[in-house]
Regions:
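Flexible loop/turn segments at secondary-structure boundaries
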Residues: 6-10, 41-45, 123-128, 182
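Glycine-rich loop/linker segments at domain edges
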Residues: 16-101, 179-181
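General beta-strand structural signal in soluble alpha/beta enzymes
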Residues: 1-2, 32-36, 118, 177
């Protein structure tokens, strides 16, 4: 058996990713097009990396309707132990890419990211990038239920107010819809 130091030095971790993207939106914040290139850190050899990358690939649109999408990806061999499957199995990495893009859009437009997210949520009869038509989706209903229960805009305002009056500590808030599985 390995001691803890040997175990940490020789076993894989969650796959680290980098990504480059271009995203196009209209004046109202509706996403029109999204192009993303994912770089996956596989480690010394592939192991389970191709399957994890495949899941990331399928989840780069998150829970949003994006009419025009192009996804490219590469698994990079690096000088570390091979990475392994972890909870989420590539979905968090693909989701992180689109969520980051949405936050950048919101910042440039001077609105909260939750506004952009709500406008682009998957709705009944939307089609996913790989051709699956959603006859019925609960994304919008879940968002609206959450908003009724916690008043998203009010909580965001409370966080902003706290952050403007406190210099040493800050708070954050996020709402992230997750689409998992196909």
């Amino acid at each position: 058996t390995l001691n803890r130091n040997e175990d940490i030095a020789t076993t894989g971790k969650r796959h680290a990713y980098s990504f480059d993207y271009k995203i196009g939106v209209d004046a109202d914040g509706k996403i029109l097009a999204y192009e993303v290139f994912l770089y996956q850190q596989a480690g010394a050899f592939a192991d389970i990396s191709p399957a994890v990358l495949g899941r990331s690939f399928l989840h780069t649109s998150g829970s949003y309707y994006i009419p025009n999408i192009k996804v490219s990806a590469v698994s990079c061999k690096t000088n570390i132990p091979p990475n392994n499957a972890f909870r989420g199995f590539g979905v968090p990495q693909g989701t992180f890419a689109i969520e980051s893009a949405i936050h950048h859009i919101a910042e440039k437009m001077g609105v909260d990211a939750s506004e952009i997210k709500f406008k682009n949520l998957l709705r009944d009869n939307d089609t996913l990038p790989y051709g699956m038509r959603l006859e019925k989706t609960n994304a919008l209903r879940c968002w609206e239920t959450l908003d009724k229960q916690v008043d998203i805009a009010k909580r965001i305002a409370m966080v902003k107010e706290y952050n403007t009056t406190n210099t040493k500590t800050k708070r954050g808030i996020a709402v992230i819809p997750v689409c998992f599985g196909i």
